[in-house]
């Protein structure tokens, strides 16, 4: 089962990804972790990434897709994986699709956690106020201002992925504003039919 979980910052992707990993026994593949591991291992693609990072450049989509391609060949990913932090753009989604197709694979499901962005901002503001009320400092990345910037970046860059996968017929949506356990139950209901197709 090959899964992508989409949703804005604060939607609960981290929590739900952990539960998917536990339920289906597939690894969560974080592009950041994979990059660091490839660099440390000195793989051809890792060496290429290292040179780019050391020069202060951004690692290209081609390099990231190459790292994902290497990682999914490892034994623990044979039954599938959940991608974390990738793809972030439609161009990356297209490159990922081409790479999987070249291996005779495809995505099982792309699930978007749908949330009310105003409610998310409200949650962050409430959390910041509670932290201040306890006499503690609010972490810079937990301030409502920074959170709003992250939401805007998501809307501009990553939100178009929903339309891209919807057009391909692979997008499923789950209401991310529900209690955490209800979100998990809805996610499992969406994902479990794909598990049977893989097993048969």
Swiss-Prot record:
Keywords: ATP-binding, Cytoplasm, Kinase, Nucleotide biosynthesis, Nucleotide-binding, Transferase. Transmembrane segments: none annotated. InterPro entries: Adenyl_kin_sub, Adenylat/UMP-CMP_kin, Adenylat_kinase_CS, P-loop_NTPase. Residues 126-142 are annotated as: LID. AMP binds at residues 31, 36, 57-59, 85-88, 92, 139, 150. Monomer. Consists of three domains, a large central CORE domain and two small peripheral domains, NMPbind and LID, which undergo movements during catalysis. The LID domain closes over the site of phosphoryl transfer upon ATP binding. Assembling and dissambling the active center during each catalytic cycle provides an effective means to prevent ATP hydrolysis. Catalyzes the reversible transfer of the terminal phosphate group between ATP and AMP. Plays an important role in cellular energy homeostasis and in adenine nucleotide metabolism. This is Adenylate kinase. It comes from Methylobacterium radiotolerans (strain ATCC 27329 / DSM 1819 / JCM 2831 / NBRC 15690 / NCIMB 10815 / 0-1).
């Amino acid at each position: 089962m090959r899964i992508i979980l989409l949703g804005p910052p604060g939607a609960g992707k981290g929590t739900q990804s952990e539960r998917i990993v536990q339920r289906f026994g597939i690894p969560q593949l974080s592009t950041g972790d994979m990059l660091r591991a490839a660099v440390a291992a000195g793989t051809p693609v890792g060496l290429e990434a290292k040179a780019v990072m050391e020069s202060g450049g951004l690692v290209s989509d081609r390099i990231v897709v190459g790292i994902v391609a290497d990682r999914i060949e490892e034994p623990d990913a044979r039954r599938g994986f959940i991608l974390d932090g990738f793809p972030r753009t439609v161009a990356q989604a297209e490159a990922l699709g081409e790479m999987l197709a070249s291996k005779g694979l495809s995505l099982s499901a792309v699930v978007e956690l749908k949330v009310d962005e105003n409610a998310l901002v409200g949650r962050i503001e409430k959390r910041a106020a509670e932290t201040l009320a306890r006499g503690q400092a609010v972490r810079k990345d937990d301030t409502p201002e920074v959170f709003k910037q992250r939401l805007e970046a998501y809307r501009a860059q990553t939100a178009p992925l929903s339309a891209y996968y919807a057009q391909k017929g692979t997008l499923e949506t789950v209401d991310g504003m529900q209690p955490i356990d209800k979100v998990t139950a809805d996610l499992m209901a969406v994902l479990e039919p794909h598990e049977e197709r893989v097993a048969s």
